[in-house]
């Protein structure tokens, strides 16, 4: 399932079909947020059922918002700058996603740090994709 979703994202050329890219990044981030929420609710049980539902929604929708902002920013940046395969587009998208997280938490420090870290991580992922880096190499038998 996961490789299919990631392939769906990478198969769309940067700077085109921004709505499909945003949908893909939103769905990936939503699953990540739902997973984090499941761990949070399991390891730190809420007092009531409604508190648990609220925490799951908070984690899931925050992650979905970060993913949507990332997808839209990278795509629009690639389209406006007319440089589709530039890691700077991904830095801008990661930074915008980090700023969204900071706005959600009402904390400038978290927003600034997340901007830098998400931007660097997204740029490295794009550089690795362009240069063919293998994160998990297949074993040679």
UniProtKB/Swiss-Prot annotation:
Complex I is composed of 45 different subunits. Keywords: Acetylation, Electron transport, Membrane, Mitochondrion, Mitochondrion inner membrane, Respiratory chain, Transmembrane, Transmembrane helix, Transport. It is a multi-pass membrane protein. Accessory subunit of the mitochondrial membrane respiratory chain NADH dehydrogenase (Complex I), that is believed not to be involved in catalysis. Complex I functions in the transfer of electrons from NADH to the respiratory chain. The immediate electron acceptor for the enzyme is believed to be ubiquinone. One of its GO terms (biological process) is mitochondrial electron transport, NADH to ubiquinone. It comes from Gorilla gorilla gorilla (Western lowland gorilla). Its main location: mitochondrion. This is NADH dehydrogenase [ubiquinone] 1 alpha subcomplex subunit 11. It is found in: Mitochondrion inner membrane. PANTHER family: NADH DEHYDROGENASE [UBIQUINONE] 1 ALPHA SUBCOMPLEX SUBUNIT 11, NADH-UBIQUINONE OXIDOREDUCTASE SUBUNIT. It comes from the Eukaryota. The chain crosses the membrane at residues 21-43, 58-80. GO terms for cellular component: mitochondrial inner membrane; respiratory chain complex I. The modification N-acetylalanine is found at residue 2. Belongs to the complex I NDUFA11 subunit family. InterPro entries: NDUFA11.
